[in-house]
């Protein structure tokens, strides 16, 4: 069974996501709930989407979870679940606005990852979007938009919210990666060996690398790299 996401993408139905969402609503109130009751509610939601093929969307499933929580008498949990959905929607809209203003769809992916890592309200993407909007101008270039976004994050940095500095660095890192990718494409640099050779010819790397390692070894070394470590900021 497939589910339609908000962006139109299709993903395979996973009832574990429903179970996790229900558990989080109880964690938010500190109320205990048995695994059997969670399973019961998951089954009820699952039966609903099985019986209604036209409603197999993330939005409709979440609506059903709300109703299911209330039907079982868990009103406080339903209230927090609704609030959580509202905040997530706010975050999503703020990120989409920034990506639209910068004309950069990949930027949305970066900001979604940031939002998942920095969940405190003080690091809301809504706050970033509002500050960014104060710097943005109609028709500005992609570079200017990214610069404005970095500036927005920097100016949000305070003793109470110091991680905005890290978030600005994450956006700066993304801009650098884009710049490097464009240069690699222009120069036709596809393998790690080609990149090392270019850097050596430019005098940025020492000759010792190419003198001590062959092309196959250097390309193999690239497999040990973990790009996601760039996100440790």
Regions found by a protein language model. Name each.
Residues 1-233:
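Extended catalytic cores of very large enzyme megasubunits
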């Amino acid at each position: 069974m497939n589910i339609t996401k908000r962006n139109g993408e299709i993903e395979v139905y996973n009832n574990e996501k429903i179970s996790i969402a229900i558990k989080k609503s109880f964690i938010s109130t500190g109320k205990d709930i048995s695994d059997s009751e969670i399973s019961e509610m998951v089954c009820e939601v699952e039966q609903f989407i099985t019986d209604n093929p036209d409603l197999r969307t993330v939005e409709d499933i979440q609506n059903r979870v709300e109703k299911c929580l209330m039907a079982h008498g868990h009103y406080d949990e339903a209230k927090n679940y609704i609030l959580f959905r509202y905040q997530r929607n706010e975050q999503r809209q703020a990120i989409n606005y920034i990506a639209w203003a910068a004309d950069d769809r990949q930027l949305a992916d970066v900001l979604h990852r940031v939002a998942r890592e920095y969940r405190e309200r003080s690091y809301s993407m809504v706050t970033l979007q509002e500050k960014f909007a104060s710097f943005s101008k109609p028709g500005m270039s992609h570079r200017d938009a990214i610069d404005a976004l970095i500036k927005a994050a920097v100016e949000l940095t305070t003793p109470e919210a110091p991680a905005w500095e890290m978030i600005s660095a994450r956006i700066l890192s993304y801009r650098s990666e884009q710049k490097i990718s464009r240069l690699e494409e222009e120069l036709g640099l596809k393998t790690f060996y080609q990149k090392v050779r270019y850097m050596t010819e430019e005098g940025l790397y020492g000759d010792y690398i190419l003198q001590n390692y062959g092309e196959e070894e250097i390309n193999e070394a690239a497999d040990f790299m973990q790009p996601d470590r760039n996100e440790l900021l």
